[in-house]
């Protein structure tokens, strides 16, 4: 079984810093150059629309040199997870996230991808 690759962050913003600023180098080191596109799962976000959340996260990942796609825009979300180079889950409401993962059928494909060694980045609820 491949080694699991997890980067788990407690938060997305440190006092006096910008979004994911404190984790930029860790994310770049973790993903490396082999990953060009990450799949973002915005389902923990409840204070704003998924589109607004994606715009914020996409801007930061593009600054780091990565393309970002969002699972909420995919016609076949489980297939998108199965094909992803890396999975990124943002923070927010843990209960909303878990319910959404169950209802969209993403929990099992995500679990399998993590077991397969696909990089997983999550902060807060993610």
Language-model-detected regions and their locations in the chain:
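Residues that form generic nucleotide/phosphate-binding pockets
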Residues: 26, 30, 100, 113
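Short, catalytically relevant binding-site loops at active-site mouths
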Residues: 46, 94-95, 126
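Catalytic nucleophile loop
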Residues: 88-91, 114-126
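Glycine/threonine-rich flexible loop motifs
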Residues: 94-104
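Catalytic-core regions built around general acid/base machinery
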Residues: 104-117
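N-terminal beta1-alpha1 cap of cysteine-dependent amidohydrolase-like domains
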Residues: 1-90
């Amino acid at each position: 079984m491949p080694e699991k690759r997890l980067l788990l962050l407690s938060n997305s913003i440190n006092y006096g810093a910008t979004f994911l600023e404190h984790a930029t180098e860790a994310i770049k080191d973790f993903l490396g150059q082999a990953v060009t596109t990450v799949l973002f799962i915005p389902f923990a976000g409840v204070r704003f629309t998924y589109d607004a959340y994606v715009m914020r996260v996409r801007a930061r990942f593009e600054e780091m040199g990565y393309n970002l796609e969002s699972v909420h825009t995919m016609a076949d979300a489980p297939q998108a997870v199965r094909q992803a180079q890396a999975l990124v889950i943002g923070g927010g409401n843990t209960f909303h996230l878990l319910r959404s993962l169950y209802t969209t059928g993403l929990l099992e494909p995500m679990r399998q991808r993590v077991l397969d060694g696909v990089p997983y980045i999550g902060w807060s609820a993610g």
